[in-house]
Amino acid sequence: MTTGFLQKIFGSRNQRLVKQYQKTVATINALETQIEKLTDDQLRGKTDEFRQRVAAGESLDKLLPEAFAVCREASRRVLKMRHFDVQMIGGMVLHYGKIAEMRTGEGKTLVATLPVYLNALAGRGVHVVTVNDYLAQRDAEWMARLYNFLGLSVGINLSGMEHDQKQQAYAADITYGTNNEFGFDYLRDNMVYETDARVQRALNFAVVDEVDSILIDEARTPLIISGQAEDHTELYVRMNALPPLLERQIGEEKADGTGVEKPGDYTLDEKARQVFLTESGHEKAERLLAEWGLIGEGESLYAPQNITLMHHVYAALRAHTLFHKDQHYVVQNGEVVIVDEFTGRLMAGRRWSDGLHQAVEAKEHVKIQSENQTLASITFQNYFRMYAKLAGMTGTADTEAYEFNEIYGLETVVIPTNRPPKRIDKQDQIYKTAKERYDAVIRDIRDCYERGQPVLVGTTSIENSELLSHLLKQAGLPHEVLNAKQHEREAAIVAEAGRPKRITIATNMAGRGTDIVLGGNAEKQAAFIEADDSIPADEKARRIQKLHDEWETLHEEVKAAGGLHIIGTERHESRRIDNQLRGRAGRQGDPGSSRFYLSLDDPLLRIFAGDRVRSIMDRLKMPEGEAIEAGIVTRSIESAQRKVEARNFDIRKQLLEYDDVSNDQRKVIYQQRNELLEAHDITETITAMRHGVITEVVRQFVPEGSIEEQWDVPELEEALRNDWQLDLAIQEMVNESSSITAEEILDAVTTAADEQYEAKVAMVGRESFSAFERSVMLQTVDRLWREHLAALDHLRQGIHLRGYAQKNPKQEYKREAFELFAAMLDAIKQEVTRIVMNVQIQSPEQLEEAAEQIEERGGHLENVEYQHADYADAGAPVANVTTAAAAATATADMVGSAMTHGGPGGEMPKVGRNDPCPCGSGKKYKQCHGKLS
C-alpha cells in the first residue's frame, strides 16, 4: 500500500526514466533546425568529426544528442522516415544497455539505427542480432542506405558464407546476423589453428531484436558443434518395437497404495515432459529384450553392461509418448524436422540430443542419422553475457522483466506508444470440449468475414492449424495458412493479412518480422512493380499511384469494420506469446480487437487449471455449446500461466548455474588456446610442462625427501625407457655414490630430458619445431576438451541422485567438475610431453609429415554439424554426446585426433594472473589453472 502511495506521488521507475529521457529529446529537437541546414556532404562529414572527438576521449554519452540529431536528419533524407520522439527515447534506452519494450508497429528497426550509429563511431564494431537470415538480410539492406550515407560500413553475417566474406562482415562498422551464426562463429574461432583464421573481433556492443525470443525462449537450448560418434542405428530400429507393447499407467501410486486408476508399464509426467517405467514395465521390458536376444536371460536392465540399452529404451519411449508428428516435428523429404514450439517455424538442421532424434526417426521409419559427439558448445545466456554492452528490443518484455534483470542484469523500460492504442481485448470464452470451441471460432470468423473485417487466427501447433483449415473449408470460408510448412510464402501472406475479408491462420506469430497493415501492404506490392524492368518508368509511377489510392480506400474500409480481429484458439504456456499474438492488432493507433477461445481439453488447462474450471462449469450446469466468460476463470488461467513461467524460469536459472561451471572452464581453455595461437615461441610452456611431468614420474619411484631403501630404481629406469625414450643408468649412479639424494636423481633425469629435447630442436631448427609443438598442443587441448565435455555431460545426467544421499547436487557437480578439469589439465601436460619426447625426427620434412599426421587424426570428426538442439523441452541433457572411447584409444601412439576444419570466434575476456581463477577453486589464476600457460 505504501509503495502504491509513493508511486502516485513520484511515479514508477519506468515513468521517471522516460521523463528523464524526454529532457534529452528536447535537447535533440533543439538541434534539428541547425542540422537541417547542412548539405549532404556536411551531414556526412559529421561522422568524421564525431570519430575524432571520440578518439580524443569524449564519451559517447556526451555525443548522444548531436549524433541522434544527425542520424534522424539522415534518415529523413535517405529513408524518407523521421524518428518520432518516442523512438528517440527507445534509442536512448538501447544505448544505455537496457531493454526497450515497444509495441508492434512502432518501428523497432528504425529505432535501432540511433544507438547503432552512435556506438559504431567508437570503431569497435556493433552487432545487430535478429532471429533469422531473412530478417538480417532485409534489415541490413534496408538500413545500409542510411549507414553508408553517413560514411559507415555494413556487413551481413549469414550461415553458409565463405570464410573471407565473414571476415569482411565482422570488420565492418556494423554487422547484421542471426543469434545462431554469431554464437557458432565464436565457437569456431576457438577451434582454429591460425590467428588469421578467426573472423570475430572483441565482443563490444550487441542490439538484440526480439530479445525475449533469443534470451529467454532459446536460453535453454545450447549451440552445439558436433562430429559423428559411434553408430547405434540397428539398436534404435529394434528398440522402436518396444513402446507399442507397453501400456500407460493412469494415475500415480500414493504412499498408502492408492491412486492408480489403471495399472500399466509406464507413467507420463506431461508437466516435466518425462516418462518413467513402472516396476511391471521394467519386468516386461527385460522379458521382451531377453526374447529378442538383446540382454541375457534373467539379466537386469540396470546391470553395468546394459546401461546403454536403458538409454535406448527411454529414448524410444519418449519418442512414442511425448513427441507427436505435426506438433513437435514434421517429416519432410524423408527427414524428421523439429518445429519450434514458440514460433511454429521449421528448424531445419537442428536435432534433439541424447539419441531422441534417432528414436523419432526410427518411429517414423525414415533414415536414421548417426549420433554425434560434442566438439564445442555454449548457451546464448553465456554468449551474450560476454558483450561489453548488451541491449535488446521487443514488443513483449515486461512479463519477463525480472528474469532479464536477474540473469543478464538488463533493465526493461516500457516505451510509450506514438499514438494511444485502440485495441479491445475481450474476455476469454471457455468451452467444455474442443469441438464446441472450434464451432464458436468458426461462428466468429464467419461474422467478421461477412462484415469485411480481416481475421488472424493463432494456433499453437501445425496440427491445430491444419484442423482449423479443414473446418474452414467445410464452412466454405476462403483462407490462407501460415505455418512452418509454408515458410517460403510467409512474408507475402503476412503482407496481405490486413485486407478486407482476409482470413489468415498462423502458428505462433513470434518473430515473423512483418507488420500487418490494415488494407494490405501497398509498399510490398509497389516494390514488385519497381523491380520489374519491363515496365516503362511513367507506367510504373501511374500503377504505384493507383495502388496507393486503392490502398487508402481499403484502409478506411477495414478501419470502419473494426480493424484486424485476433482469435486465439488456445492459451500458450507463456503470457508473452499470447501478448505477441494480440499485439498484431491495433498497430500505431489503428482499431483492432482480440479474443481467446479455450476448451478444458487444452494442455494448459488440463494440466494446471482444469479441475477447478470444470467444477465451476459443473456447478453452473452449463448446457452444451455454452461458454464461460468470467474474470475469475481468466484470472485462474493467467495464474496457471504464471506458475508455468515461474517453473520455466527456475529451469533456466538452474541450467545457467550448472552451465556456469563449464562456462568458467571454457573461459580458461579458450584463453590459453588464444595465448598459444598468439605466442611466437612456446618453448617456456613446453619446458615447464616437461619438468612438471618428469618430476611426477620420478616422484612415483623416488619420493621427495626419501632414503635409498624406499626407492624403486629398476622400475623408474623402465618407465623412463618405455614411456619417455630416456635410457639412463640410474642404478649405476646410485651404486657409485654413497650420498646421492632424491633431488639429485630428479636433476639428473630432468637434465637428460632437456638434452634430448635440445638435440631434436637442433636437428630441425627452432622455428620448425616450435610450429610442431604448437600443433601438438592445440590438437591435444582440443581432443581432451571434447572428452571433458562428454565427461561433464555424463556427470550432469546423474548428479541429481546425490540429493538422496543428503548432498547438494549443485555443490557436488561443481566439486567433481573441478576435479575433472584439473585431471584434464594434467592429462594435457602428460600427453603433450609424451608426444614431443617420443617423436623421432631426422629432418624438417619428417617434422612436417608428423604435423600432417596429427591433423589427419581428426578424420572421424570430419562430418561437422551445427545444432541448436532443444534438449530442455525433450527432457534431454545439455550436450548430445556419446562417450568418445574410440577417440581416446586412437591417440596412444603419437597424438590425439584433431579438428579438421578451421573457422570463426571472438576474443575471450582476459583473466589476469592475480585474479581469482574462474574455475571457482578460490586460488589465484597463476597458482591454479594458469600454470598450464
Curated annotation (Swiss-Prot):
It comes from Burkholderia cenocepacia (strain ATCC BAA-245 / DSM 16553 / LMG 16656 / NCTC 13227 / J2315 / CF5610) (Burkholderia cepacia (strain J2315)). Zn(2+) binds at C917, C919, C928, H929. Its main location: membrane. Belongs to the SecA family. Coiled coil: none annotated. SMART domains: SecA_DEAD, SecA_PP_bind. Keywords: ATP-binding, Cell inner membrane, Cell membrane, Cytoplasm, Membrane, Metal-binding, Nucleotide-binding, Protein transport, Translocase, Translocation, Transport, Zinc. Its cofactor is Zn(2+). May bind 1 zinc ion per subunit. One of its GO terms (biological process) is protein transport by the Sec complex. This is Protein translocase subunit SecA. One of its GO terms (cellular component) is cell envelope Sec protein transport complex. Part of the Sec protein translocase complex. Interacts with the SecYEG preprotein conducting channel. Has a central role in coupling the hydrolysis of ATP to the transfer of proteins into and across the cell membrane, serving both as a receptor for the preprotein-SecB complex and as an ATP-driven molecular motor driving the stepwise translocation of polypeptide chains across the membrane. It is found in: Cell inner membrane; Cytoplasm. It is a peripheral membrane protein. InterPro entries: Helicase_ATP-bd (IPR014001), Helicase_C-like (IPR001650), P-loop_NTPase (IPR027417), SEC_C_motif (IPR004027), SecA (IPR000185), SecA_CS (IPR020937), SecA_DEAD (IPR011115), SecA_motor_DEAD (IPR014018). It is an enzyme of class 7 (translocase).
